[in-house]
Amino acid sequence: MAFDYKKEYKALYQPPCTPHLITVPSMTFAAVRGQGDPNDPAGEYKAAVELLYGLLYTIKMSKKGSYRMEGYFDFVVPPLEGLWEQTGAEKENFRWTSLLRLPEFVTRKEFDWAVREATAKKKKDFSRVEFFTYDEGLCVQCMHLGSYDDEPETLARMNAFAAEQGYAVDFSETRFHHELYLSDPNRTAPEKRKTILRHPLKSSL
């Protein structure tokens, strides 16, 4: 049976709808950085997501080819994630990093092979996809149910909870507003979408 990160790491992928603290371990991702409106069907964001899934499925399906990855195990491709820089409300100015978690057996060597393999087989340039390590640390987290545009209400509850616990949001050049998308927006009504929200924290004392 394929390893499913959502089921094996429920604290990370199936949190409650109430704000809570969590320490997120260091993980490696396939990542694409960009700027622009994520809702633009012809925009940079959509292209980035297609690259990420193309690379992850190249890794997943390597079991059917001649290349052998040491320690390989079959896996369910984890949920799409996004790191968002706080640059105002205009969506065309959003700066983001789109992410898909990599299985632990994917080293830099295996990642570089997958980039070359995907580029050759799919006739598309995958060189924009980065091998990215993110050590998120202490965060406040909450499951948001509903439209992406309604996130501010959930974020306000999260930040208020963090303040009650003696913490403040800690955005920086290396720590960001973080979203994990458990619902396909093309197949799920806005009011039924599930999105995990995370904010990095520091002590306010």
Model-predicted segments: where are they?
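A solvent-exposed interaction/effector surface
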Residues: M1-L205
